[in-house]
């Protein structure tokens, strides 16, 4: 084990007596590394009350769990003194971005994340000009990556691989068949489902028959349909959820980054949760994920009218409808809190609000948006109500996500899980530690159908995190979005230390495949 553990935490040659010792002897015979977590507060990911325990890891799996009172006996296992710290399954991020072939996920490991879910919002990581993920998946299999990866098939990628132009609304039967065949291939390769980005080009142009055709393919493999829905505006969200459910069935529908833009208060949140619960009462396994921040992060294309989005000739729009576009943008930004409510995250205005950037350029903010164009910037949009979002966040059927990636200028990419522990568990007591961990581990594992992750039990994969909840800190802010979380002492991925002593120490991640 790493040099960063203290002598008290490293007590070589001691494991529990009896059956635990026999596991260690077997591990030595197989020349597999064995590690004993001794006297930890085991929070196992099921929601069960935490309990003091000893946990033995052999190779990449958890091999034995015993009472902390078990007596020690000599063995080759290395021992980590838990000292009552929480030992939990590694966190499973339900909505992630980036590419482990090119990006470091150290900041994710720093907040206890051991598995990310890529292919979100209809688009995946860099998968080559042929738009086929097979070569990318093979490259991840060969590479040394620092985190586990679950991959979704991207709706945008499927469309383009099938030769469907971005602007097409109605697909002909041949186009539908090509998309379905490509999706079937990706599901057979191990994709966990499909993702949609229906508020973005080209998903914004897709219609229900196209989505339903894909849902049937996903259902054959027991996969999930995750969606950045058609609209997250408060007056349109129920219609968007309806579309997600009806177009996914018989596959399982899942709401990505559950939110209500412009919605206010606990009452409205309860209405939305009741709306979702009604589907579940009817036997539809509708789930959702959410991050604990009131600002989203996306491109400024979301501010523009559909008629000004690609593949429309933007120059022609400016020549013919500039004033109409300007009026639309002013109305849109006014409803979304004004130019102070958009914090730009990309050059050359990174770290400035739209109001500040416009002042710097000496122009009205609407004119700056027009100058930038739909694809000209991304940023944090402060459009959500904390009371409403927190009410959604603590619901038992809502798991957690970052919707973040390496280098993103939003604190959710570096602070989500630390914030959940620091604020929602320790400070505000909105969640018990057992429930917070279940929603970060067991629940997402159930949604993705990961039978051997998200739980601490004999036979499960050894993705583990060791920490004292009272010492966890989410250090990132909107001003300093890259500060790593603190307080997660050891993060283990597939039985090997991945993060320890405040830095990444291993590359034991794997590309996971649906079964």
Give each language-model segment a name:
Residues 2-17:
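N-terminal secretory signal peptides and thylakoid transit peptides that target proteins
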Residues 14, 30-35, 42-90:
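Histidine-rich, glycine-flanked metal-binding segment
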Residues 42-54, 379-384, 388-389, 428, ...:
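Acidic, glycine-enriched loop/beta-strand segments at the rims
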Residues 85-87, 94, 102-196, 215-216, ...:
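Divalent-metal coordination cores built from histidine and acidic residues
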Residues 91-100, 198, 225-231:
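Histidine-centered catalytic micro-motifs
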Residues 152-153, 157, 161-173, 179-200, ...:
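Active-site neighborhoods of metal-dependent hydrolases
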Residues 320, 391-397, 402-403, 416, ...:
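C-terminal cap of metal-dependent C-N hydrolases
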């Amino acid at each position: 084990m790493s040099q960063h553990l203290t002598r008290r935490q490293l007590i070589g040659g001691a494991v529990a007596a009896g059956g635990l010792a026999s596991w260690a002897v077997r591990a030595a015979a197989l020349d597999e590394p064995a590690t004993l977590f001794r006297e930890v507060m085991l929070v196992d990911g099921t929601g069960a009350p935490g309990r003091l325990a000893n946990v033995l890891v052999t190779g990449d799996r958890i091999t034995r769990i015993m009472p902390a009172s078990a007596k020690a006996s000599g063995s080759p296992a290395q021992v980590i003194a838990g000292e009552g710290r929480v030992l939990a399954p590694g966190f499973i991020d339900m909505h992630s971005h980036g590419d482990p072939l090119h990006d470091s996920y150290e900041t994710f490991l720093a907040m206890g994340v051991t598995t990310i879910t890529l292919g979100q919002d209809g688009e995946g990581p860099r998968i080559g000009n042929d738009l086929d993920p097979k070569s990318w998946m093979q490259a991840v299999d060969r590479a040394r990556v620092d985190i586990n990866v679950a991959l979704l098939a991207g709706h945008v990628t499927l469309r383009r691989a099938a030769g469907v132009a971005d602007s097409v609304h109605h697909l002909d039967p041949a186009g539908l068949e090509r998309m379905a065949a490509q999706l079937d291939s990706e599901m057979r390769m191990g994709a966990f489902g499909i993702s949609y980005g229906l508020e973005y080009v080209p998903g914004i142009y897709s219609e229900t028959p196209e989505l339903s055709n894909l849902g049937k393919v996903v259902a054959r493999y027991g996969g999930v349909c995750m969606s950045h829905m058609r609209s997250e505006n408060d007056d349109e969200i129920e219609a968007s959820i309806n579309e997600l459910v009806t177009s996914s069935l018989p596959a399982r529908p899942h709401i990505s980054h559950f939110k209500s833009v412009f919605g206010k208060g606990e009452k409205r949140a309860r209405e939305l949760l009741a709306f979702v619960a009604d589907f579940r009462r009817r036997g539809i396994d509708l789930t959702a994920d959410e991050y604990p921040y009131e600002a989203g992060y996306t491109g400024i294309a979301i501010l523009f009218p559909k008629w000004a989005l690609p593949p429309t000739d933007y120059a022609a729009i400016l020549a013919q409808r500039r004033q109409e576009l300007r009026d639309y943008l002013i109305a849109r930004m006014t409803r979304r809190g004004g130019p102070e409510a958009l914090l730009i995250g990309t050059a050359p205005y990174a770290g400035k609000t739209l109001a500040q950037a416009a002042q710097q350029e000496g122009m009205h903010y609407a004119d700056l948006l027009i100058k930038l164009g739909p694809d000209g910037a991304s940023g944090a949009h402060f459009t959500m109500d904390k009371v409403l979002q927190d009410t959604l966040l603590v619901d038992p059927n809502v798991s957690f996500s970052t919707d973040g990636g390496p280098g993103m200028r939003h604190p959710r990419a570096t602070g989500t899980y630390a914030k959940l522990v620091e604020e929602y568990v320790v400070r505000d007591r909105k969640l018990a530690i057992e429930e917070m961990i279940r929603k970060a581990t067991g629940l997402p594992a159930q949604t993705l159908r990961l039978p051997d992750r998200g739980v601490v039990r004999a036979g499960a994969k050894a993705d583990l995190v060791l920490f004292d909840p009272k010492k966890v800190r989410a250090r990132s802010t909107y001003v300093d979005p890259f500060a790593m979380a603190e307080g997660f002492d050891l993060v283990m991925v597939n039985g090997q230390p991945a993060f320890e002593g405040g830095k990444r120490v291993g590359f034991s991640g794997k590309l996971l495949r649906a079964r």
